C-alpha cells in the first residue's frame, strides 16, 4: 500500500492560515489510512471539507474530523459508524503526529487529532497513523486559538482537503 500524502487548507474565521500536508503510514496501518484518505477526498460522498477543529488544547493537540456535527459528537467512518483499532505500534513521539480520536478501544470513526507535543500516555490507546510532512508551523499556529478547557476562540476550518 502506498503512503499517500493528504493536504488540508486551514482557515481561521474564514481567513487563510495555510496548507499542511500529512504523510500517512498506510504500509503499516492501511485500513485507518484509507479511511482518512477517503474522508479527505470525499469519494464516498462525505468528507472533512468544511468541518472544523472543535477541540484545541495548547501543548497537547488539535482535534477535528466531525463533519456531521460541529461540536465533536459526530463520528462516521467509511466502514460504518465505528471500526476497530488496526494496530497500536506507532508512538505519539511529538508535534505533528496524526492519530485517531476515540471513546475507548475499537471506537474509531472520522475524528482525529494532530499532536503538538510528545504524548506518550496515548501510546497503546490511540492509533497513530501519520505525520505532518510540511508546515507543522500551521498546526502550532492553530494552538494559539485554543484553551486548556479545549474550547476555541475562533473557528478553525478545513476549507479544502484532498490527496496529492
UniProtKB/Swiss-Prot annotation:
<keyword id="KW-0697">Rotamase</keyword>
<dbReference type="GO" id="GO:0003755">
    <property type="term" value="F:peptidyl-prolyl cis-trans isomerase activity"/>
</dbReference>
<dbReference type="InterPro" id="IPR029000">
    <property type="entry name" value="Cyclophilin-like_dom_sf"/>
</dbReference>
<comment type="function">
    <text>PPIases accelerate the folding of proteins. It catalyzes the cis-trans isomerization of proline imidic peptide bonds in oligopeptides.</text>
</comment>
<dbReference type="GO" id="GO:0005737">
    <property type="term" value="C:cytoplasm"/>
</dbReference>
<dbReference type="InterPro" id="IPR024936">
    <property type="entry name" value="Cyclophilin-type_PPIase"/>
</dbReference>
<protein>
    <recommendedName>
        <fullName>Peptidyl-prolyl cis-trans isomerase A-like 4G</fullName>
        <ecNumber>5.2.1.8</ecNumber>
    </recommendedName>
</protein>
<dbReference type="GO" id="GO:0016018">
    <property type="term" value="F:cyclosporin A binding"/>
</dbReference>
<dbReference type="InterPro" id="IPR002130">
    <property type="entry name" value="Cyclophilin-type_PPIase_dom"/>
</dbReference>
<keyword id="KW-0963">Cytoplasm</keyword>
<comment type="similarity">
    <text>Belongs to the cyclophilin-type PPIase family. PPIase A subfamily.</text>
</comment>
<dbReference type="GO" id="GO:0006457">
    <property type="term" value="P:protein folding"/>
</dbReference>
<keyword id="KW-0413">Isomerase</keyword>
<dbReference type="InterPro" id="IPR020892">
    <property type="entry name" value="Cyclophilin-type_PPIase_CS"/>
</dbReference>
<feature type="domain" description="PPIase cyclophilin-type">
    <location>
        <begin position="7"/>
        <end position="163"/>
    </location>
</feature>
<dbReference type="Pfam" id="PF00160">
    <property type="entry name" value="Pro_isomerase"/>
</dbReference>
Amino acid at each position: 500500500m502506498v503512503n499517500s500524502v493528504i493536504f488540508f487548507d486551514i482557515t481561521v474565521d474564514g481567513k487563510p492560515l495555510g496548507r499542511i500536508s500529512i504523510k500517512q503510514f498506510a504500509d503499516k496501518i492501511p485500513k485507518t489510512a484509507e479511511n482518512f484518505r477517503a474522508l479527505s477526498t470525499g469519494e464516498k460522498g462525505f468528507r472533512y471539507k468544511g468541518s472544523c477543529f472543535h477541540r484545541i488544547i495548547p501543548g497537547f493537540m488539535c482535534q477535528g474530523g466531525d463533519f456531521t456535527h460541529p461540536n465533536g459528537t459526530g463520528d462516521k467512518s467509511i466502514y460504518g459508524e465505528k471500526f476497530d483499532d488496526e494496530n497500536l505500534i506507532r508512538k505519539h513521539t511529538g508535534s505533528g503526529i496524526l492519530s485517531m480520536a476515540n471513546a475507548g478501544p475499537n471506537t474509531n470513526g472520522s475524528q482525529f487529532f494532530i499532536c503538538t507535543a510528545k504524548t506518550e500516555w496515548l501510546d497503546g490507546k490511540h492509533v497513530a497513523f501519520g505525520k505532518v510532512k510540511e508546515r507543522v508551523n500551521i498546526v502550532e499556529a492553530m494552538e494559539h486559538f485554543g484553551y486548556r478547557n479545549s474550547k476555541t476562540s475562533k473557528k478553525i476550518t478545513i476549507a479544502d482537503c484532498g490527496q496529492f
